[in-house]
Amino acid sequence: LAGDQILPRITSNVSIMASEPTADPLREWLDSIAKFRAALTGDELILPAHGFPFTGVHARLDALAEGHHDRLDALEAALKEREMRAVDTFGILFARKVDDSVYGIATGEAMAHLRYLEYAGRATCIVRDGVAWFSA
């Protein structure tokens, strides 16, 4: 039973929550993906919380990790060009336009990516007038 951790077509929502604004959930999630990969043979039938059961978990775990690392690299490159708030990163992180129905979730996920870069020493955060601005 994979729950929301390993989904066949979409990625899990990995977000900074208001109750833990300094957390590093993306690092924790990527670490857990690596642990799953080491613990599973690759032949298991995966039962996700969303979508159909599937096999080939190693390829899926690799794709999930690579996708996040690709977005982190693109985000870092953009932060070298200009300062950004979490909401400024949506076009880099998400394939679809972020509408009002998912704005909060998207902001939390953007913050998770920004904090990951910050804690890895690949970005810095400055708070001005209550707004977190990131640069690399």
Positions of PLM-derived features:
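C-terminal regulatory/interaction regions
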Residues: A74-A136
